[in-house]
Design a protein with these regions (language model features):
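Acidic, two-metal ion nucleic-acid-processing modules in DNA metabolism proteins
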Residues: 1-153
């Protein structure tokens, strides 16, 4: 019976992925477990959740090399007014990598802040609609304004 070592199998997987997925891909995902280290690289996880149940349906490790991260992070934060952190949805350009020791990962090359802004606007509309349906959206408008001590006569 012929057999392969684990390294040989992983090398075969790497070469196959390089041949089948040689391009860059734009993917939509939610950021999870975003952290940077002393070298300036950013390590994170990309997740996708089922919209109905909120259960995870896909997950991948990702990284952003420091030469990209030091440009991408401020660009994203200035464009969106939001921190580059876990829990936000992003549209990123990635390459698929496979390393014999570390396994499958996605390397980030670029980001589209407009996608995140659109998602933030959608979530805001959903929250406002929910508050309106619950009858709490205009509760503060119905209160009489209170004068502060400085304005009392």
């Amino acid at each position: 019976m012929d057999s392969l070592s684990l390294l040989e199998l992983n090398s075969l997987v790497r070469r196959s992925l390089e041949q089948c997925l040689p391009d860059e891909y734009w993917i939509q995902a939610e950021l999870s477990d975003v952290r940077s280290n002393t070298t300036g690289h950013c390590y994170l996880e990309f997740v996708q959740k089922d919209p109905r149940s909120n259960n995870l349906v896909a997950k991948a490790r990702g990284m952003i090399w420091n030469n990209i991260y030091r440009l991408l992070k401020p660009y994203f934060e200035e464009s969106t007014g939001q921190l580059f952190t876990s829990g936000i949805k992003v549209l990123v350009k990635v390459t698929v990598q496979f390393h014999e020791l570390y396994g499958y990962s996605l390397t980030v090359l670029d980001i589209d802040p407009a996608y995140t802004l659109g998602d933030m606007a959608r979530r805001r509309r959903e929250i406002l609609l929910q508050l309106e349906e619950e009858g709490v959206l205009t509760l503060n408008k119905e209160l009489e304004p209170r004068r502060s001590r400085l304005h009392r006569k």
